[in-house]
Design a protein with these regions (language model features):
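Glycine- and acidic-residue-biased ligand/ion/polar-headgroup-sensing regions
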Residues: 44-55, 73-74
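Short beta-strand segments in beta-sandwich/barrel cores
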Residues: 35, 53-58, 76, 99-100
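A cytosolic small-molecule/anion-sensing beta-strand core signal
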Residues: 31-32, 50-51, 72, 96
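Short phosphate-coordinating micro-motif centered on Lys-Gly-acidic
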Residues: 35-41
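Polybasic "coupling" helices that flank or enter modular domains
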Residues: 113, 117-182
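Cyclic nucleotide-binding regulatory module and flanking cytosolic helices
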Residues: 1-35, 76-77, 81-83
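Cyclic-nucleotide recognition modules
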Residues: 18, 23, 69-127, 131
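Phosphate-/nucleic-acid-contacting segments
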Residues: 158-229
């Protein structure tokens, strides 16, 4: 993890702009797998992602995590725990090299306490995160594993995009794909093998290449038929 002094950045509208313009702002650089914060730790501050990506996850059992959300540039982390004054309810770890702007919990609370506009932005940011997580849960809750994976890939395409080689602009391990799809690692391997045989995707070294996007969309919408479970 590398620590840098605050620098001037292009400002966006909303809460992230307020954080970026704070005089005590600090920047951190987290490398892949570096931990921003852990579940049940007391919050130290607010993180605004400037570049890179972070997985928000919850421990289900020792060594077993469930990815709840994949956060990208412009998203704010740690807000709920800081505002409500309780421990982190989940953990955050970088999945790529990630640069964040950081403001301490005390500085942030001082910033918003006397400003109703800032309080409203906090509420909007919290609601947006909840909506995003709920949408992911709803989209996959009633699908079979192969449909869930197809839907997950569509979400990842929308979030990260594809490069010229039709590969996702994010590398994810089998474990991470399984966790975000809400299936087991063994099923995920079977699904990837099945999708490869069907000409939908290929997977190598963390990279997912999309071979047939229209068929992938069709698979995500299926409600019947053979499943891998």
């Amino acid at each position: 993890m590398k620590l840098e002094e605050s620098t001037m950045m292009v400002a966006n509208t909303g809460l992230e702009e307020i954080i970026r313009n704070h005089k005590e702002l600090t920047q951190f650089i987290f490398h892949k797998d570096d931990i921003l914060f852990k579940e049940n730790e007391h919050p130290v501050g607010i993180y605004c992602i400037e570049s890179g990506s972070v997985k928000i996850c919850k421990e289900e059992s020792p060594g077993q995590e469930r990815i709840l959300h994949l956060a990208i540039a412009g998203e704010i982390l740690g807000l709920h725990s800081v505002v409500n004054g309780h421990v982190y309810t989940n953990s955050a770890a970088a999945i790529t090299e990630t640069r964040v702007s950081f403001i301490t919990a005390s500085d942030f609370m001082e910033l918003i306490n006397d400003n109703n506009t800032y309080k409203l932005l906090v509420m909007k940011s919290l609601c947006s995160r909840i909506d995003s997580m709920e949408d992911h849960i709803v989209r996959i809750s009633e699908k079979m594993s192969d449909e869930r994976f197809a839907d997950t890939l569509l979400v990842l395409i929308e979030k990260y995009g594809l490069n010229k080689s039709k590969e996702l602009n994010i590398k994810l391990s089998i474990d991470e794909l399984a966790s975000y799809t809400c299936t087991s690692k063994s099923y995920m391997k079977k699904i990837i093998t099945e999708f490869t045989h069907r000409g939908l995707v290929t997977y190598s070294g963390g990279s997912v290449k999309i071979l047939n996007l229209p068929l992938l969309r069709t698979t995500a919408l299926l409600n019947a038929g053979a499943a891998i479970d």
